[in-house]
Swiss-Prot record:
Superkingdom: Eukaryota
Organism (species): Homo sapiens (Human)
Gene Ontology cellular component terms for the protein in this record: nucleus
Coiled coil residues, start to end: none
Region feature Disordered, mapped onto this chain: 33-53, 215-238, 280-302, 332-356
Gene name in the database record: SERTAD4
Name of the protein in question: SERTA domain-containing protein 4
InterPro entries reported for this sequence: SERTA_dom, SERTAD4
Compositional bias annotation for Low complexity: 215-232
Length: 356
């Protein structure tokens, strides 16, 4: 609240209207301004009342500020600090200066060394900085790989899967978990990318002993949808359990794209069939058609009548913690119970997969 007083010398304040309070306030202001050690007292009130009616200080009207004794304390400080902050630097100094990358890096290193001087244990700080730097590099690499995958097209007659994995220098350096056979050769691989939590089926080459590889089989679940709309042949997307040998009858082979679900991915090894296995395939395929509640489906074996097995040792194969037993078809569950002695070990090694 601003107090406005007349500068007329003949206008004296009236005591009944609060002149004592005004004089006391002016005494407090004078003590704060001139550094008076003694606090204001009631005896000094009439003297300060006479002094407050004096003429304004010389030169104060040029700055737009009246006598600080007759002006309220808040208004005076507002004007004072506005005048002090009124100074603006020239526009030339406000222009953006371009700094090279080397100068910026040198400045960062210099500031880091200055900070290390005041740290009690620099080794802990350096270790933490290295961890943060590695994490940032890994995140950057994952972002790059999510936008543009660095895996080249790997044909069946090209480089083997093992040589391809060892030769590539990808920014994503996490060790892939693959299924190994006794002969230490990689037939197919399922790679888990943590960006988005998708399973990727990489186009790795199969064993050189196998002449031609066909697409793997899958049993569609109740809620399966069409996995791909392109004209390319479908990718292998069946499901399997850990360390279980499946017969060919437990899997059905399809050609159309709409019959392959995209919610399950697994790894298979390929071997040729004998004459007895071919007969067994035809018999059990007819039984599967009658048990399937979706009606008769047009499907036929593909390629050179190859069977697919889950054979070999699986090392910590994608333990995601999901349990997708409900998504498996009833006929598929029955065939698994026949082949497995212990039902609790019927755990899907791959689940929640999708193609990118």
């Amino acid at each position: 609240m601003t107090l406005v007083l007349s500068m007329n010398r003949f206008c004296e304040p009236i005591v009944s209207e609060g002149a004592a309070e005004i004089a006391g306030y002016q005494t407090l202001w004078e003590a704060d301004s001139y550094g008076g050690p003694s606090p204001p007292g009631p005896a000094q009130a009439p003297l300060q009342g006479d002094r407050g009616a004096g003429p304004p200080l010389a030169g104060s009207h040029y700055r737009g500020i009246s006598n600080p004794i007759t002006t309220s304390k808040i208004t005076y400080f507002k004007r004072k600090y506005v005048e002090e902050e009124d100074f603006h630097p020239p526009l030339s100094s406000c222009s953006h200066k371009t700094i090279s990358i080397f100068e910026e890096r040198a400045h960062i290193l210099y500031m880091s060394l200055e900070k290390l001087k005041f740290i009690d244990d620099p080794e802990v700080y350096l270790r933490r900085s290295v961890l943060i730097n590695n994490l940032m590099k890994r995140i950057h690499g994952e972002i790059i790989m999510q936008n543009n995958w660095c895996f080249p097209a790997c044909s069946f007659n090209g480089t083997s899967a093992q040589e391809w994995f060892m030769a590539q220098d990808c920014p994503y350096r996490k060790r892939p978990r693959m299924a190994k056979e006794e002969c230490e050769k990689f037939h197919a691989c399922c790679f888990y990318q943590e960006c988005g939590g998708h399973y990727l089926n990489l186009p790795l080459s199969v064993n050189a002993n196998v002449g031609s590889a066909s697409t793997a089989a899958s049993s569609p679940s109740a809620s399966s949808s069409s996995s791909s709309s392109s004209s390319s042949p479908p990718l292998p997307l069946p499901s399997c359990s850990r360390q279980v040998d499946f017969d060919v009858g437990s899997a059905s082979i399809y050609k159309s794209d709409g019959q392959i679900p995209a919610n399950e991915i697994f790894v298979t090894n390929v071997r040729s069939l004998g004459v007895q296995e071919k007969a067994k395939l035809n018999d059990e395929k007819a039984n599967d058609d009658t048990n399937r509640d979706g009606g008769p489906l047009s499907h036929e074996p593909v390629g050179n009548d190859l069977a697919f097995e889950c054979k070999g040792q699986f090392y910590d194969y994608f333990e995601t913690g999901y349990n997708e037993r409900n998504n498996v078809n009833e006929s598929w569950k029955k065939s698994l119970r026949k082949k497995e002695a212990s039902p609790p070990s019927n755990k899907l090694c791959c689940s929640k997969g999708s193609k990118i």
